[in-house]
Amino acid sequence: MFISKSLVTFGRYFMLMGRTFSIPERMRMFMKRYIKEMSQLGVDSILIVLLISFFIGAVICIQMKINIQSPWMPRWVSGYTTREIMLLEFSSSIMCLILSGKVGSNIASELGTMRVTQQIDALEIMGVNSANYLILPKILGLMTIMPFLVIFSSATGILGAYGTAYIGHILTPEDLTLGLQHSFNPWFMYMSIIKSLFFAFIISSVSSFYGYSVEGGSVEVGKASTDAVVCSSVLILFSDVFLTQILS
């Protein structure tokens, strides 16, 4: 029963994506909605990304210094491990998990409300491809802005680590700088950005599917928002394993 239901949901998702990825009929209207979605989904999320990244970067640096530093290890190890954790996992995977809660529920509730208030039906009656009109700008908008959020997250996390060095005196700024620069591999930054593009697609497309497919009333809209966040989070973790293996 569970397998058959999952296959049906999987098929409906691909059918919706087939309708979504078509050439927009009115490019000017599409660009207007595309820019609006970039602002609503991405720019409005910058503050929470910066706040979380700053404090997580500080906490990681403190934990690394306290728990793995020893007289037999170089003093720059804390800075090195902080950089690797921020670049490889936190700024892409964990940050996208956090954004799936904010952005995913936003998308699902918006489209779900439009469905139960028959706004999507009105678009269909007017001959508009509602999936393309409503969903495609969200997917492309989030995929466009997500790499910038990853870069901001990495930079802010490192600033948080410097905060512990200058204010908390956990380690010297010189040792932290030496660790941040040690054996730096630029590919790790590109890998983080590539992973974030996949995660942005998962968040926007899955949340759009659950919101667009709502049947019922306001209770079902809330349930769709919850299902969208849960499913997006699971798929992000699942795909992170394969993307890390492929890109490493």
Give residue spans per PLM region.
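Selective transmembrane-helix segments that form parts of the transport pathway or gating/packing helices
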Residues: 42, 46, 50, 90, ...
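Short, membrane-interfacial amphipathic segments enriched in basic
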Residues: 1-32, 210, 215
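Active-site cofactor/substrate anionic-group-binding motifs, chiefly glycine-
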Residues: 41-94, 98
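Final/C-terminal transmembrane alpha-helix of multipass membrane proteins
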Residues: 221, 227-243
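Hydrophobic alpha-helical transmembrane segments that constitute the membrane-spanning cores
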Residues: 52-55, 99, 136-165, 198, ...
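Short cytoplasmic-facing helical segments at TM-TM junctions of multi-pass membrane proteins
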Residues: 111-135, 221
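Membrane-interface helix starts
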Residues: 25-51
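Membrane-interfacial helix-loop-helix connectors in multipass membrane proteins
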Residues: 63-87, 154-197, 205-224, 246-248
